[in-house]
């Protein structure tokens, strides 16, 4: 699947991730799936990582509920989540794979490993034959 995110939303995620580093930053993504097969991110939600650690994240449940209500009020579809890896590459960790339970979701991971060179990738994670499989999705910053 091809996914698009605006430069403005990319910058919003990046700036927040820098502001909470060395902790992982996290949030949700919302938008629409177009008939053309393109997933369009129309809004990103910056949410609190209640774990306050650089190794994993848990989204604040109250903030998550507020974000879901906002999506519904604005006619947006929940598309998945995003989080940062302050000290590791932009790919799902074993923990990320273990916690990925929505086969329809896109998982965006922003690496801050290389100073001044943020790397954002999108992934699809699903259970196949008893194992979690990861597929990189095409992500366009427009």
Annotated model-derived regions:
Residues 1-78, 87-142:
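Conserved beta-strand-loop surface patch within small alpha/beta domains used
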Residues 84:
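Short, well-ordered beta-to-alpha junction loops that form the rim of enzyme active sites
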